[in-house]
From Swiss-Prot:
It holds the Pfam family SCAN. Its main location: nucleus. This is Zinc finger and SCAN domain-containing protein 26. The gene is ZSCAN26. GO terms for biological process: regulation of DNA-templated transcription; regulation of transcription by RNA polymerase II. Induction: By serum stimulation. May be involved in transcriptional regulation.
Length: 478
């Protein structure tokens, strides 16, 4: 069966004329301006100019059918790049583009502000918007799909029709619930109705609404304030818009804390209150962990299913979540976005920064009972204690060498495989260990962080400083 592909931009606007009133339905299929990135690739696949050229090519611009098909194929290849991207990546882009097209325009703008990079990011942004809207008032999920109609020519109404329109303009709440809205934009009257173009009032369906030249009723209707739900304190006459604000206020009378978390006493109270106001209603049946959003539960369940759709283009490693891939890519790029405000040291992960900051916060360290060595984290102490227990449960299948840590075994495997995943962005030289890359980058940056306390001479590596001190300051060190 042949399928006819019709560009949305070629559809003529729908014109309806009745007694001097012309209604034009706005074209919903607007071009999505923000390009999207495929997982594991830093180059944007959905480049808007290429997509736009492909969508807007006209048959009249070519000499015939053969050239038209050839041109379409060429533009499609330039846009989707099938020689460098998988079928799943191309499918992801097309699904994303169509999904963003069918979104209401106001949601398109809100999503575009967050620059999402995947389908999961779009879902999370939209669910966050739904939760934010839910705090001010629940929306009716069965509300009919709206379409915007532009009233360009208006004829005066007479007699009973004029009174009926005036009566409907004064009724605010029923029309709002049924999906009708009237406003003025750029000097033109805009009427938003349900999908059939009819205005519902007092439970009755009337004929398509015709505008009149008396704007006073419309202005009086728009001037009515929107009803707000207020929460009143039983002890005092104070009123609150948010229910959580009332609960927090009530704690001042009872003396009971809003929650036992220390965050309630910190500067991040606003964000923490949002967490308290949202129940974790989505629970994983495998491990019992609960989540606030269904998208977070779906993302978590990939761990149990073993699904790993996100692959690194540099080394081929796969991940179950996009966040894991982005964090892994920092190994190849050398990016360390988390900065310690106390000493200026940078870290690749936020958990590494938190662990490091315990040194500055003077928290009680974890001490090894065997040798007295202290650690800022209990996990590091556990790893250290394997030295004393001589437990080396991780064995190399190639040479039989055993290691106490999995990370040591992974690093050792690179000797057999010849893998060098850490590449310099400046000269493209690759290294087996991240520490070797860090030392190499100092050559390009002319960085010498190790300084002699005696003479002030600086070195790129700690070993160079030790050699210098042994040779020039041997007497003072002794």
């Amino acid at each position: 069966m042949a399928t006819a592909l019709v560009s949305a931009h070629s559809l003529a606007p729908l014109n309806l004329k009745k007694e001097g009133l012309r209604v034009v339905r706005e074209d919903h299929y607007s071009t999505w301006e923000q390009g999207f990135k495929l997982q594991g690739n830093s180059k944007g696949l959905g480049q808007e100019p290429l997509c736009k050229q492909f969508r807007q090519l006209r048959y009249e611009e070519t000499t015939g059918p053969r050239e038209a098909l050839s041109r379409l194929r060429e533009l499609c290849q330039q846009w989707l790049q099938p020689e460098t991207h998988t079928k799943e990546q191309i499918l992801e882009l097309l699904v994303l583009e169509q999904f963003l097209i069918i979104l209401p325009k106001e949601l398109q703008a809100r999503v575009q502000e967050h620059h999402p990079e995947s389908r999961e990011d779009v879902v999370v942004v939209l669910e966050d918007l739904q939760l934010d809207l839910g705090e001010t008032g629940q929306q009716d999920p069965d509300q009919p799909k709206k379409q915007k109609i532009l009233v360009e020519e208006m004829a005066p109404l007479k007699g009973v029709q004029e009174q009926q329109v005036r009566h409907e303009c004064e009724v605010t709440k029923p029309e709002k619930e049924k999906g009708e809205e009237t406003r003025i934009e750029n000097g033109k009257l805009i009427v938003v109705t349900d999908s059939c173009g009819r205005v519902e009032s007092s439970g009755k369906i009337s004929e398509p609404m015709e505008a009149h030249n008396e704007g006073s009723n419309l202005e009086r209707h728009q001037a009515k304030p929107k009803e707000k739900i207020e929460y009143k304190c039983s002890e005092r006459e104070q009123r609150f818009i948010q229910h959580l604000d009332l609960i927090e206020h009530a704690s001042t009378h009872t003396g009971k804390k809003l929650c036992e978390s220390d965050v309630c006493q910190s500067s991040s109270l606003t964000g923490h209150k949002k967490v308290l106001s949202r129940e974790k209603g989505h629970q994983c049946h495998e491990c019992g962990k609960a989540f606030q959003r269904s998208s977070h539960l779906v993302r978590h369940q990939k761990i149990h299913l073993g699904e790993k759709p996100y692959q690194c283009n540099e080394c081929g490693k796969v991940f179950s979540q996009n966040a894991g891939l982005l964090e892994h890519l920092r190994i190849h790029t050398g990016e360390k976005p988390y900065l310690c405000i106390h000493c200026g040291k940078n870290f690749r992960r936020s958990s590494h920064l938190n662990r490091h900051q315990r040194i500055h916060s003077q928290e009680e360290p974890c001490e090894c009972k065997e040798c007295g060595k202290t650690f800022s984290q209990a996990l590091l102490l556990t790893h250290h204690q394997r030295i004393h227990s001589h437990s080396k449960s991780h064995q190399c299948n190639e040479c039989g060498k055993a290691f106490s840590l999995t990370s040591d075994l992974i690093r050792h495997h690179r000797i057999h495989t010849g893998e060098k995943p850490f590449k310099c962005n400046i000269c493209q030289k690759a290294f087996r260990l991240n520490s070797h890359l860090a030392q190499h980058v100092r050559i390009h940056n002319e960085e010498k962080p190790y300084q002699c306390s005696e003479c002030g001479e600086a070195f790129r590596q700690r070993s160079g400083l030790f050699q210098h001190q042994r040779y020039h300051h041997k007497d003072k060190l002794a």
